[in-house]
Amino acid sequence: MDQDIKTIIQYPTGATEFDIPFDYLSRKFVRVSLVSDDNRRLLRNITEYRYVSKTRVKILVDTTGFDRVEIRRFTSASERVVDFSDGSVLRANDLNVSQLQSSHIAEEARDSALLAMPEDDAGNLDARNRKIVRLAPGEVGTDAVNKDQLDTTLGEAGGILSEIKQTQQDIGDYIEEFANGTTYLKNIVMVYNQGSANGGETAIVLDRTDEVFAVPVIYINGDRQEVGFQFSYDNTTKTITLVKPLQRGDFVVMLTSEGTHSLASILAGPDGASRIGASGGLTVQQAIDRILESHIILPQWFGARGDWSDTTNTGTDDTAAFEAAIEMAVTLNYTEVYVPAGSYLITRELNLNGGNRNTRLGARIRGAGWASSVLVFKAPAPETPCISIIGTPGSHTSKGVEKLLIKSHPSTTGQGIGILCRNTCFAHVTEFLIANMNIGICLENYMTAGSFTEFCYFTNGRLFTNNINIQFNKVQNGDNSFHGSNFKNIQNQVKKNGGIGVQIVGNPQGAAYLYNMTWDMQFFGGAGCIAMDLNYCNTDYVGGKLTGESDLTFKADGNSRFDFHGRFDSIGKVIWDTATEGARTGGTYVFANRTSLENAVMTNADAGRLPAGVSARPLPADWADRNNNGVYPATFHIRGPNIESMGFVTYDSPGNGFFFGQLPFQGNIKDFNPRFWFNSGGTSFNTAATAYTMKLVNGEGLYFSDTTIRALSDGNVSLGEWNRRFKEARFTSWDIGTSIVPTSTATKDIGTNSNRIRDIYLANSPNVTSDSRKKSFIKPIDEALLDAWETIPFSQWKLNDSVAEKGSEARWHVGYIAQKVEESLQAFGLNAGDYGLITIGDDGFMLRMEECLVVEAAMIRRKLGLTYK
């Protein structure tokens, strides 16, 4: 077989495996057949043949009755390998594949045409050593004759050569069917004048209802003719103008698409995109229109290359293309700029407002993912941002950044700002990575009061070894208010040896005031890593969860405080580098579980009220990550059937306990002053006061001091009850147990002249000391005393207290009246005060009745004349 035929090959049967000598786009475009002179069988893939490799097939059926195996490429014009379903991106590879498919179709058309018995270089029809079957009889002298006609002619001497004319008609019909058939790519192959030129033509008008955009190639008797050389084409009139006129009988095939030149011709026109099909019955132009309607702009439309190489450190400057894309997005009513995968060199600020505008609305910029869409920023100055979101305070913006990696150019490492949010509200930045810049993210209140940044959201991002990963910056007289800006799932990789994770910068004109924020952030540190740096900063209601690893330093000047409603937990070393802590603070830094004062020794620790060397820190409510240490100290819930109680626990070791105390107004936590404390063993209760009152709701209670324990009111409090008694009591003057015993002899009294005991009930008479060794000046009773005693009358009476209590029921008492005793003694020249018979106090007179009765007995004895023996 003549191997000028590129897409059809036949092998003799006998083998089972056969090579595919041509390239193809899809296996469905390759046809394998068994053929003979009068029969053909198209085989099915997998069941009747299979692919051994990409370039070899194996026959699986019996080849009896066939002498050849034919492998033919038959590329479909309707089943496009590339359908441009995603009209948002026209890739060079897709265009090449589409061109290749068109080229294959054209090549197959050429082979089909050549197989249709083309002319050779001498102008003769060439059957290529094959039989011509179904040949009509010739009609004129120059017609071919078939075998029957030849036999008839030879046998009958009559010519039926006129039937050969039908052969020409059949060939023309076949070629025309080939050109117009639905199984071939329309507007690709056309045959002129049914396959035979009239002769002398210098122009061919294409009689087609569909538009013919370009005719880059024609074949005249198989000889390739190039547009611009052997002919020209006017697509407005559909006219081909030939350099040389045609000869009679020339076979002319016109190809309307071949190679890159043809496809470029189609796409070059203003309506080129409307000529390319896409999925769903759309054209590429329709797909582009829908993209524009959905507000997505590509920098590639404006020449972006995305060809930066980290290996060679070279690439096209795509800044202008990005600026143009942003400008178009703004023009199309604040739409989105989509950044396909690639690395793009940027050398100027990309303002999402477009140009140098400062407006509320602007474009969003979105990449294919931070691992795919990369902006390499060659910063012209340390403070120049790669992307800026600049707006008007107090109103929400449409601007945002998503799925991008922003990193520094190798020549400007540590320079520039990744993303600047200035005087803007509600900007969203998500799925990002910013690396090796001067500042990763800067939130800036710029220049004037009322210029503030608020409610910006940063999620699912990593800030990697920028000089400052996150900065809040109050510039000059910019508003001090930063509020509502939240960070969620942020990895803050701090640059070693001086890098800062979060920096908050105010100024003497006003502190940067952060409030109503939620932070979920993980700090990664190391040698010289500063987690936070405060300069003129204050906060309210900033909360969330912060964690750390490796060494992290927290710095602050003397004008700053950072209160965080959430924990900061770290498995690394934490260093507090703060100015002198203020007198009114729990620490410059305060978290739910720790404070920058956590290593400061408490003032009262050395006063004996607290254990030596202790410091204060907040008590977390949860037990997590404390299980290995017994979860102390802690408060906890005690539960059971009908039990809902509180528990308090501390470490059971000397020096531990529960401390309750006070701070002066606006005092420092390290100046905590314990007032009451219990030891952990429950063996002591202590107070720092010199006097203490235990008071009941009705006002009764006890008063304790260093000298006294007494009731709070007079006569209402009992010590013990009839069935709840004290066993013993020890006092300075008395010991009370089984006896009431004074602590020293003859020095204690029971009652006083003004506070008397009403009744004493005794089982035996009182014992009175009468030991001569305890007495001095012993002598007989004075006669004058006995004389006076004879004049003292006996009386009976009722006590006033009893009358007041019992009235007429008060009982009578008998005895002496003390005043009468005094008067009688005075009448006989005696001083009653010289005798222990009478006690005179502020509240009245009292008599020692046992001594009075002794005088009475001595007086009677004298009257009876009884004398001592």
Curated annotation (Swiss-Prot):
Cross-referenced InterPro entries: Endosialidase_C_dom_sf, Pectin_lyas_fold, Pectin_lyase_fold/virulence, Phage_T7_tail_fibre-like_N, S74_ICA, Serralysin-like_metalloprot_C
Localization per record: Virion
Record's keyword annotation contains Protease: yes
Residues annotated as domain Peptidase S74: 770-869
Entry PTM: Proteolytic cleavage and release of the chaperone in the host cytosol stabilizes the folded protein. The cleavage gives rise to the mature tail spike protein but is not essential for catalytic activity.
Record carries keyword Hydrolase: yes
Family, per entry: In the N-terminal section; belongs to the Teseptimavirus fiber family.
Subunit description: Homotrimer. Interacts (via N-terminus) with depolymerase 2 (via N-terminus); this interaction probably gives rise to a branched tailspike.
Protein name as annotated: Depolymerase 1, capsule K3-specific
Source organism: Klebsiella phage KP32 (Bacteriophage KP32)
Taxonomic path: Viruses, Duplodnaviria, Heunggongvirae, Uroviricota, Caudoviricetes
